[in-house]
Amino acid sequence: MMQSSKWNAMSLLMDEKTKQAEVLRTAIDEADAIVIGIGAGMSASDGFTYVGERFTENFPDFIEKYRFFDMLQASLHPYGSWQEYWAFESRFITLNYLDQPVGQSYLALKSLVEGKQYHIITTNADNAFDAAEYDMTHVFHIQGEYILQQCSQHCHAQTYRNDDLIRKMVVAQQDMLIPWEMIPRCPKCDAPMEVNKRKAEVGMVEDAEFHAQLQRYNAFLEQHQDDKVLYLEIGIGYTTPQFVKHPFQRMTRKNENAIYMTMNKKAYRIPNSIQERTIHLTEDISTLITTALRNDSTTQNNNIGETEDVLNRTD
């Protein structure tokens, strides 16, 4: 029987003086492959939250009318007309995709895994990876993307993008309604278009690009299923555990060479079968990732200026 791999990162946990950033850095360095699951907690750590001033300053009229608690509740609301639906969604997409700046934790993570075998699955639908200029062949958007549109009747498997129309909707809307003629229409059946995001009842349109992303992700998992794999879960809650949390735990259990690492202030239940191969990091996600990059002795010794450029980007 093959002996399971030894992880120095697990040993570091035994030392109370060890910083969490060092544990993260060590695990990334020693992994043969890294499967990264990213949820809303990572974008929120960069300040891209769905609550507070970011919500109240951009949607005061919707809050007054519907008493919404946050943007998530507002985005799931069954609006009475397509004019109102697109009045909200056009503002939401502009804020959370078209105009959302680059996140510092995404830049730092990209540098941390540079040169490693890695693949990302994300339940986020914002622009974070595009803004940070990731190689998108390593990213799988399992929940869709805000900028994409699909037929509301799901009459065909194709998504569409029209940035200019979204911006025009924001400018033209009045009293929480866009002009009737601006409602995007399906080119096949003429039904109104909607945002390409997964719904519990009907799912979402999964086009050729979606399936290409899925195929690349599955191929990576299969290629490294027995390797020394770090299953790194960042900012994932329990809203949709079937996409990241449960598969990561299951793959860790099946591969004795793997460890499961979660970055989350909340402590969710860990199956008994993998508790001894689980690392739970509780510090602020953005701070933890950027600190791990700064503490990378190789990066600091070889190219200090490049590291500082990554962490200081604001475009």
Swiss-Prot record:
Keywords (A to Z) from UniProt: Glycosyltransferase, Metal-binding, NAD, Nucleotidyltransferase, Transferase, Zinc
This protein's record includes keyword DNA-binding: no
Chain ranges of the Deacetylase sirtuin-type domain: 13-299
CC cofactor note: Binds 1 zinc ion per subunit.
Molecular function in Gene Ontology: metal ion binding; NAD+-protein mono-ADP-ribosyltransferase activity; NAD+-protein-aspartate ADP-ribosyltransferase activity; nucleotidyltransferase activity
Record field: catalytic activity: L-aspartyl-[protein] + NAD(+) = 4-O-(ADP-D-ribosyl)-L-aspartyl-[protein] + nicotinamide
Domain of life: Bacteria
Regulation: Is inhibited by Tenovin-6 in vitro, but not by nicotinamide.
Cofactor: Zn(2+)
Amino-acid positions noted as binding NAD(+) in the UniProt annotation, renumbered to this chain: 40, 123-126, 143, 238-240, 264, 268, 285
Classification via InterPro entries: DHS-like_NAD/FAD-binding_dom, Ssirtuin_cat_dom
Positions bound to Zn(2+): 151, 155, 186, 189
EC number: 2.4.2.-
UniProt xrefs under Gene3D superfamilies: TPP-binding domain
Additional remarks: The SirTM-mediated ADP-ribosylation can be specifically reversed by the Macro domain-containing protein encoded by the same operon (SAV0325).
Entry's family note: Belongs to the sirtuin family. Class M subfamily.
Protein purpose: Catalyzes specifically the mono-ADP-ribosylation of GcvH-L (SAV0324). This activity is dependent on prior lipoylation of the target protein. May be involved in the modulation of the response to host-derived oxidative stress. In contrast to other sirtuin classes, lacks protein deacylase activity, being unable to catalyze delipoylation, debiotinylation, deacetylation and desuccinylation of proteins.
Protein name: Protein ADP-ribosyltransferase
Organism name: Staphylococcus aureus (strain Mu50 / ATCC 700699)
Organismal lineage: Bacteria, Bacillati, Bacillota, Bacilli, Bacillales
